[in-house]
């Protein structure tokens, strides 16, 4: 079990969302005791709390990128990741880890959102694309991994546990 969280500042106001996201991550820290990673870019902040199952080395650290343009946060498992690795290596991709996160990242880079059609498993994937200044979040077909979304006029936020949203409440 891992945990993901993120906030998109829709109005680009001056509130420091990195501290808010760190507090969200502390609230759900039990989901990923092995590593915690953060990324802030423009009006996006992402975090990942990792329970290292597939590849316990730092090569599976998230948010993950192999080009500093496209970043992924991933919670779950792609059961057929070896099959997808074979398809991607046949067209020239190289892999440095045994992490299905790296497989998902490269599959997205190659096939875009159609990549998710290839995945068998249970997962939630969030992808920040700096080149397009965009973010997508996708769940597996059955929606087996928890994902909660909160949106108001200023923010869109997501978290693996609903209690993480407590951090969105400004201190009095």
Task: Identify the meaning behind each predicted range.
Residues 1-172:
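Cysteine-centered catalytic environments shared across enzyme families
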């Amino acid at each position: 079990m891992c945990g993901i969280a993120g906030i998109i500042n829709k109005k680009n106001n001056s509130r420091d969302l990195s501290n808010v996201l760190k507090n969200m991550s502390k609230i759900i820290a039990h989901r990923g005791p092995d590593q915690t990673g953060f990324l802030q870019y423009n009006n996006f902040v992402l975090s990942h709390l990792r329970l290292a199952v597939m590849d316990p080395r730092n090569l599976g650290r998230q948010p993950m990128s192999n080009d500093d343009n496209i970043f992924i946060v991933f919670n779950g498992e792609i059961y057929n990741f070896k099959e997808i690795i074979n398809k991607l290596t046949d067209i020239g991709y190289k892999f440095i880890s045994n992490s299905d996160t790296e497989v998902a990242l490269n599959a997205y880079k190659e096939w875009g959102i159609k990549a998710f059609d290839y995945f068998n498993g249970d997962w939630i994937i969030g992808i920040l694309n700096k080149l397009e200044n965009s973010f997508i979040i996708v769940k597996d077909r059955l929606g087996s991994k928890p994902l909660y979304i909160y949106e108001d006029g200023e923010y869109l936020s997501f978290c693996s546990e609903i209690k993480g949203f407590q951090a969105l409440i400004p201190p009095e």
